[in-house]
Design a protein with these regions (language model features):
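A short SAM/SAH-binding and catalytic strip from SAM-dependent methyltransferases
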Residues: 1-6
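A short glycine-rich, Lys/Arg-flanked "PGG" loop and its adjoining helix->strand segment in the class I
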Residues: 8-23
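Short, conserved clusters of charged catalytic residues that mark active-site
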Residues: 9, 59, 119
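A generic structural signal for ordered secondary structure
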Residues: 15, 72-73, 139-141
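Conserved class I S-adenosyl-L-methionine
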Residues: 23-48
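Short N-proximal segments of mature Sec-exported proteins
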Residues: 50-52
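Short alpha-helix
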Residues: 55-78
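Conserved Class I S-adenosyl-L-methionine
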Residues: 77-141
Length: 141
C-alpha cells in the first residue's frame, strides 16, 4: 500500500537484491476488474487514503503485472481473493483466537481506534466489488 513511485522503487530494489532466477512475492490490495473506470479507481484510492491515513494506491491485476514486468520480472503465478481484511473470521484466521480477543478489546475500549476501524470497514464494504487481495510471484530474469 504505497504511492505509485514507491512501488517502482521497492520493486527495483528487490530486483537489485535477487540473483537471476530469484523469486519475489508480493501480497497487496488490488482493484478489479482490469477495465475499472479511471474515475471509479481514483475515487476508491481517495477514499482509502482518507480512511487509513496512508496514500494507498491499489492497482488492477494488469497494472501490477505491467509494473513488475517493466522492472525486469517474469510473472510466475497470480492469485486473487476477496478483500476480507477486517472481517471477523479473517482476523481470527490471521491473528489466532486469543490475539483476536485482544484486538476486539482494544477496539471496544479505544474510541479513536474504533472510529478508525469502522471507517475503514465501511470503505472496504462499500467498494467490496472492486477491491481484492492479490498475491503475485515473479522471477528475476
Amino acid at each position: 500500500m504505497q504511492a505509485d513511485h514507491r512501488k517502482s522503487e521497492i520493486i527495483r530494489e528487490a530486483y537489485r537484491l535477487l540473483r537471476k532466477g530469484g523469486l519475489y512475492g508480493i501480497h497487496e490490495l488490488g482493484l478489479t476488474p482490469d477495465q475499472l473506470a479511471e474515475d471509479k479507481k481514483a475515487g476508491i484510492q481517495q477514499e482509502l487514503a482518507k480512511c487509513i491515513k496512508v496514500n494507498a494506491r491499489p492497482l488492477t491485476q494488469s497494472e501490477w503485472v505491467h509494473l513488475l514486468e517493466q522492472e525486469g520480472f517474469r510473472i510466475i503465478e497470480i492469485n486473487t481473493n476477496p478483500m476480507l481484511l477486517l472481517e471477523t473470521k479473517r482476523i481470527i484466521d490471521d491473528e489466532g483466537f486469543l490475539r483476536s480477543l485482544k484486538i476486539g478489546f482494544n477496539i471496544i475500549t479505544q474510541p479513536k481506534a474504533r472510529n478508525q476501524i469502522l471507517k475503514m470497514r465501511e470503505v472496504f464494504n462499500r467498494f467490496k466489488e472492486n477491491m481484492n487481495a492479490i498475491a503475485i510471484v515473479a522471477e528475476k530474469v
